[in-house]
Amino acid sequence: MPANGNPIIAFMSDLGTTDDSVAQCKGLMLSICPGVTIVDVNHSMTPWDVEEGARYIVDLPRFFPEGTVFATTTYPATGTATRSVALRIKQAAQGGARGQWAGSGAGFERAEGSYIYIAPNNGLLTTVIEEHGYIEAYEVSNTKVIPAEPEPTFYSREMVAIPSAHLAAGFPLNEVGRALSDDEIVRFAKPKPSTVSGGVLSGVITNIDHPFGNLWTNIHRTDLEKAGIGYQTQLRLLLDGVLTFDLPLVPTFADAGQIGDPVIYINSRGYLALARNAAPLAYPYNLKAGLTVTVTKA
């Protein structure tokens, strides 16, 4: 529970908002933990896409009070023996969100603190664990926090939403079920990391930033620094070995000039990205995640 005593659940799912599924989950959260603040992270992620969901939840501790419970779910294996996992992570203290990349804007201060994630044990927490590590992890099996006979087609409600509310209300994390060893926590295979060699940066498109159609890569700002690249450096970006963009690295979209002009920038998560000014890039060209990216100084 946050230090101010007001419980918070940040809720992400693939349930959509065209029926009452999310409302059922939130109603139960409120019934179990009256007064809880529920923040909707995203309910429109691609159904069953564990890797996409992982990207939406990894940065959340930077922006939430200590003690927040992150209820995160896409449950392709609903109704099977796949259980949920609840773990505590420790967010390190940090200053401004993007260091030198924050320009002249003031950063923010975040004291270190612990947070709880609950998710299906299907790899959804892969990136969270990689980024933050964890202090303790448990299988969610105690019938004090989940139904004795959970609805098999709705584990997102039964095995994530309901126990998240019990945790937000103060139920001890170490009593939700047995402790899990590290090798029992499922991870998905991560793509090969970006590389820097001889001034050439190589990476991939990790995802499309919907609904804007921007292309995000796995080339981090630290990779750019290693290659001596900063804002206004003229770059040549080769996409999938076919499309070439000769552009400077700039802070934001409007620096591209005209509406529709392409732009290379650092996204809010600290990674190199490619877009068009106030227009989609991915959709007109049918560009997808997984395409290769090569960057050099022009």
Swiss-Prot record:
S-adenosyl-L-methionine binds at D14, D19, D20, S21, Y75, S156, D209, N214, S268, R269, R276, N277, A278. GO terms for molecular function: adenosyl-fluoride synthase activity. Transmembrane segments: none annotated. It comes from Actinoplanes sp. (strain N902-109). Its EC number is 2.5.1.63. It catalyses: fluoride + S-adenosyl-L-methionine = 5'-deoxy-5'-fluoroadenosine + L-methionine. Catalyzes the formation of a C-F bond by combining S-adenosyl-L-methionine (SAM) and fluoride to generate 5'-fluoro-5'-deoxyadenosine (5'-FDA) and L-methionine. Keywords: S-adenosyl-L-methionine, Transferase. Belongs to the SAM hydrolase / SAM-dependent halogenase family. This is Fluorinase.
